[in-house]
Amino acid sequence: MVLRSRPLASIPRVQFYSSKGKSKGKTSGEKKPEHKKIPVWHKLKALTSFTASSLLVVGGVGVSGVVLYLILSELFSPSGDTMLFNRAVTLVEDNEEVRKLLQCNDSSFKKERLKAYGELVTNDRWTRNRPIVSTQKIDKYGKCHHFMRFHLESKKKLGLVHVEAVDSEQNYKPNFVSMYIDIPGEKRFYIIRPKLRQVVRPKSIFGFPWGSRKE
C-alpha cells in the first residue's frame, strides 16, 4: 500500500479576522466634539448687513413708486403741464386770426402745420433745448393758478404764447382765463381776454361815498 502526500499549497487555509479595534460604532467612552461658539460681533455684523440691505430694498421700491406716480400724474392728470400744453396748442392753432398773423400758408385743402415748443435756450435750432416754462400760484381764495408760455412757429413767423388757467370747481380740467400771443411786428392778440374785476362801490350818503371800495 502506497501513501501519497498532498502538497501544502493545495491545502486550503483558513484565516481568522479579529474585530477588535475595527468597530465602526462609537464606544461609550468616546467624547463628543464640542461646537465652537460664534462671537457676538459676527452676529451683529450679519444683522447689520441684513438690516442695511432691507432698508435699501424698501427705499428703492419707495423711490420708484414716487417717480412712477409723478410721471403718470404729469402725463395723464388733467391739471398736469402736458395736458394743459396740448389743450392750449390746439386752441391757438385753430384760431384763424392767429394763423393770419403768423402768415401761415393755408389753402382750402390743406393747412400749414405749426410747431409748438418751449424756451429757446440757444439760437442754434439743432442744439437748443426746449423746456416748457410753467409755474403755479395759490391765490387768496385757495385756487391754484397755472401760468405757462411756449413758442408757436410757422414757416415765416414766430410767436410767444402766454397762458393762464385756474382750477375749476365743476370739473378736473383747469379753465383758461387768459391767453394771448406776441408776434414781432404785430400787436398783441388775445385768444382769451381776461375778465375785468368788477369794483363794487358802497352806497353814498348825501352825495359822498361811504366806506372803502370793495373788489
Curated annotation (Swiss-Prot):
Residues 77-215 are mitochondrial intermembrane. It is a single-pass membrane protein. Essential component of the TIM23 complex, a complex that mediates the translocation of transit peptide-containing proteins across the mitochondrial inner membrane. Required to keep the TOM and the TIM23 complexes in close contact. At some point, it is released from the TOM23 complex to allow protein translocation into the mitochondrial matrix. It is found in: Mitochondrion inner membrane. One of its GO terms (cellular component) is TIM23 mitochondrial import inner membrane translocase complex. The keyword Acetylation does not apply. Its main location: mitochondrion. Residues 16-55 are mitochondrial matrix. It comes from the Eukaryota. Component of the TIM23 complex, at least composed of TIM23, TIM17, TIM50 and TIM21. The lineage of its organism: Eukaryota, Fungi, Dikarya, Ascomycota, Saccharomycotina. This is Mitochondrial import inner membrane translocase subunit TIM21. The keyword Zinc-finger does not apply. Keywords: Membrane, Mitochondrion, Mitochondrion inner membrane, Protein transport, Transit peptide, Translocation, Transmembrane, Transmembrane helix, Transport.
